[in-house]
């Protein structure tokens, strides 16, 4: 469980939108913001997953609103922000978790998969930053979680570089009271217990302890996941 001092973080009753909240890093980040008193907008392309994590957030004693939204589709992005404004009249922060995965070797990458990667991570980050500039005019934060470093193929590295460029550019044009930063995990998500270092950084960047921190890309070294028994170990245990 990821716990912080609420007084130190200053997240009580803050309105925080978490994309990709239904799974992986997004789910863990949403739960941690909830534990620290924030109202969490759980956004996911799968409405059932958005609703499920919203239910988990409410079980933690926080307020949650699920919204089905694909951040690579500009109309979905606009509708998501408009709905948040209708419900709350304001937004304090955004955590956008990029979601594309590719295990395809670079020499075998096809055009269709390349465009899917661009849509899922670069377009979505651009759209979220665009709306963030509009809806966070009173101050706040945008934290982007980039593709993990363990994905070493050149096309994934290019995606990371593009998102990093968006963070740098947004920092130059956003008001100084809006903090835009990025987090790069060392590996893919495996579960809240083993991903807590990433979650702590994502929550800290949205809190008062990071006031004035802008344009940073923070690499987070996560512990290796627990060893999974090989199939022959499992077979050995059968009667």
Question: Residue spans of the language-model regions?
Answer:
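Conserved glycine-rich Rossmann-like NAD(P)H-binding loop of the short-chain dehydrogenase/reductase
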Residues: 38-52
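Catalytic loop of short-chain dehydrogenase/reductase
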Residues: 126, 141-172, 184-191
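Conserved glycine-rich cofactor-binding loop
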Residues: 22-23
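Substrate-binding pocket helix/loop in short-chain dehydrogenase/reductase
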Residues: 105-106, 113-118
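Conserved NAD(P)H cofactor-binding loop of Rossmann-fold oxidoreductase domains
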Residues: 97-103
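Conserved amphipathic alpha-helix within the SDR
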Residues: 54, 58, 65-68, 73-89
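C-terminal helical subdomain
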Residues: 182-239
């Amino acid at each position: 469980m990821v716990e912080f001092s609420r007084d130190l973080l200053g997240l009580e009753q803050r309105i925080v939108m978490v994309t990709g909240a239904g799974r992986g890093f997004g789910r863990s980040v949403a739960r941690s913001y909830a534990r620290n008193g924030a109202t969490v907008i759980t956004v996911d392309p799968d409405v059932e997953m958005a609703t499920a994590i919203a239910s988990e957030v409410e079980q933690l004693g926080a307020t949650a609103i699920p919204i089905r939204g694909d951040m690579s589709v500009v109309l979905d992005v606009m509708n998501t922000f408009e709905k948040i404004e209708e419900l709350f009249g304001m937004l304090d922060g955004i955590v956008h978790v990029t979601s594309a995965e590719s295990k395809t070797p670079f020499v075998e990458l096809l055009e269709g998969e390349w465009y899917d990667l661009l849509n899922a991570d670069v377009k979505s980050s651009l759209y979220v930053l665009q709306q963030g500039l509009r809806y966070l005019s009173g101050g706040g934060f945008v934290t982007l979680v980039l593709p993990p470093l363990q994905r070493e193929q050149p096309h994934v590295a290019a995606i990371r570089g593009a998102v990093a460029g968006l963070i740098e550019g947004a920092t130059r044009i956003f008001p100084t009271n809006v903090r835009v930063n990025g987090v790069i995990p060392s590996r893919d998500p495996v579960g809240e217990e083993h991903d807590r270092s990433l979650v702590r950084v994502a929550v800290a960047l949205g809190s008062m302890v990071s006031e004035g921190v802008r344009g940073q890309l923070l690499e987070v070294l996560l512990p290796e996941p627990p060893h999974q028994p090989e199939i022959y170990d499992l077979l050995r245990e059968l009667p």
